[in-house]
Every structure is written in structure tokens, then in C-alpha cells.
């Protein structure tokens, strides 16, 4: 077999989390992105949950924010770069370019920020990984090929099984991740986009402060995205019993937990914190009406450094 040299060996990356909850005593800039959280839903929940306004009292809530794209794959690169994808180049080329040309990343680097990225779904290569202190090339091994077969068969069955059996073929991406053993890694823990895992790690470790360079952290969590595996208090439930509204409340519980940990640390006043989503929610197939199918209502809450208010600003 002859090749032109265009084929490249698959590279595995670890998005390390050892420093995820370690802040700088100088300055910090954190973007906490909660997938699929619709601002219309949060606005409705504000009346039912006055604790939202209390916990986010130092934030400004931009309830009329309009998102750029309706899906994560397009939205997140735009959020990080401000560069539209015009469909005039391969998407991987665009994904690489937005890192290299991002005014946000360029400014952060010029100002001496150490950058951490916790979003394994974005484009990455060995050249770009050096921009981020927590991304490393590692080896992965399966802990059990037998256990791997079950989610793999469900994945295959979702396409090839008869329609009535497809409902039995749902699976979670985490089912694969749980079977991976990371080798040759410089960090003991990896970033998790699963909300309850992120929250449990936060509650266990807390937020600490160190004498170090300024820090930028981009943290992308599953948020209110399907499957709906949480009740309103972030307890795990059968996804068939879950709803979007419950998932939205659960992800707000996690976001408030992060804010409170930060508030109780010495890093609160020197941290810019943006709590946002990549896009809104478009309803289920059983719903109808024009408003149901609009996904542009993205969540946006912003707290500046040394910013304090008596109640959340809207």
C-alpha cells in the first residue's frame, strides 16, 4: 500500500483538570459554558427561584441575548473568535484558524494569561495544544473489550435496528469514556463535561488560590442538553423521566455552586466570570408553534472584577 503522506496517526489528548479549581491571586477570567440553556426558560424560573437572583446578585443578566448559531459545533468557535463560518473552507481548517487568529486568545497571551481549555469536542492538533497548559498527548487503552461491546452494539443498533428497537439503543458518550484508561499522562485527573461529576469534583476540592500568573479557563459542561438525566436538584434519574426544565434547573444548581465556591475564596473579586450557553432550546418534537423552534435565546450572565450589587442586574 502506498500513500501520499496525507494520512496521519491518530493522536489522543488529555484535557487535564488538576488545576481546574486553582485560581491566581492576580487576575482570573473564567467562561463557564452550559450547553443548551435557554434564556427564556431561565427568565421564567427566576420567578419560581428567588435564590437565583441572590446567588447571582453581582452579575448582569442579559435576557435578550441573541446567539449566533443553533448548534454547539458552530457556536463555540464563534464565541471564542467572533469569526463567522462562511462555508468557504473545510470546517477543520476554520476550527484551527479561529484558535490562531482569535483576538481573545491573542489578547490573553499578550497580557500574560495562562490558558486552560476544558472542551474536548473542539478541533485540536499538536500545534494548537501548546497554547493551553492543560492539554497533553497521551495514550488510551480500553479497560475491558467485553464491556466495550455493549455500548458499541447500541451505537450500531441505533442505525440498523428496526424502528421499534431503536428506542432500546440509546447510549451515553460517558459509557465509552468510563472504559478508557489514560496512560503517559502528566495530570492525575481529566476534565469532565458531565455536570454532576464537575460539581462533585468542585465540592471535594473547593477553589484554591495560588501565587501564579493570570489564569483563563474555558469550561464547557453538558448543561441542559439531552439526555435529561437529572431532576431539578441534579440527582440522577432515568432519562425517560427527565424533562428539559428539570435539566435547566439542575445545571443552574451546578452554576450556583461554582459561584458560591468562588465567592468564598480569595479569588472572587479578581475574577471575571461569564456564565453562558452556546445556544437555546428548540423544544421537543411533540411541541408546536414558531417560538418552539427558535434556538437563538442563549443564556448570558456576566460579573466583572470587583463588581458588587444588591441584586442581579437585568
Task: Show the residue positions of the predicted features.
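Catalytic domains that recognize anionic headgroups
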Residues: 1-314
Amino acid at each position: 500500500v502506498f500513500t501520499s503522506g496525507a494520512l496521519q496517526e491518530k493522536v489522543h489528548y488529555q484535557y487535564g483538570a488538576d488545576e481546574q479549581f486553582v485560581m491566581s491571586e492576580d487576575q482570573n477570567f473564567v467562561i463557564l459554558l452550559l450547553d443548551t440553556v435557554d434564556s427564556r426558560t431561565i427568565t421564567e424560573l427566576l420567578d419560581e427561584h428567588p435564590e437565583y437572583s441572590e446567588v447571582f446578585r453581582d452579575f448582569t443578566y442579559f435576557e435578550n441575548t441573541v446567539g449566533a448559531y443553533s448548534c454547539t459545533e458552530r457556536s463555540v468557535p464563534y464565541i471564542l473568535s467572533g469569526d463567522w463560518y462562511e462555508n468557504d473552507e473545510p470546517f477543520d481548517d476554520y476550527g484551527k484558524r479561529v484558535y490562531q487568529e482569535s483576538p481573545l486568545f491573542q489578547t490573553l497571551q499578550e497580557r500574560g494569561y495562562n490558558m486552560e481549555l476544558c472542551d474536548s469536542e473542539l478541533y485540536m492538533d499538536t500545534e494548537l495544544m501548546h497554547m493551553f497548559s492543560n492539554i497533553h498527548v497521551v495514550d488510551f487503552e480500553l479497560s475491558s473489550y467485553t464491556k466495550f461491546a455493549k455500548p458499541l452494539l447500541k451505537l450500531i443498533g441505533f442505525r440498523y435496528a428496526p424502528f421499534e428497537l431503536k428506542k432500546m439503543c440509546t447510549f451515553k458518550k460517558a459509557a465509552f469514556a468510563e472504559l478508557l484508561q489514560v496512560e503517559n499522562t502528566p495530570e492525575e485527573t481529566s476534565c469532565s463535561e458531565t455536570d454532576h461529576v464537575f460539581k462533585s469534583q468542585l465540592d471535594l476540592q473547593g477553589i484554591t488560590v495560588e501565587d501564579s500568573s493570570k489564569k483563563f479557563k474555558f469550561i464547557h459542561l453538558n448543561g441542559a442538553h439531552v439526555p435529561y438525566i437529572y431532576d431539578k436538584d441534579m440527582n440522577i434519574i432515568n432519562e425517560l423521566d427527565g424533562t428539559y426544565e428539570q435539566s435547566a434547573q439542575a445545571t443552574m444548581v451546578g452554576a450556583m455552586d461554582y459561584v458560591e465556591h468562588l465567592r468564598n475564596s480569595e479569588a472572587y473579586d479578581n475574577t471575571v466570570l461569564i456564565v453562558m450557553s452556546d445556544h437555546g432550546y428548540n423544544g421537543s418534537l411533540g411541541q408546536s408553534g414558531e417560538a418552539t423552534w427558535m434556538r437563538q435565546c442563549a443564556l448570558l450572565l456576566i460579573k466583572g472584577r470587583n463588581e458588587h450589587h444588591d441584586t442581579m442586574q437585568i
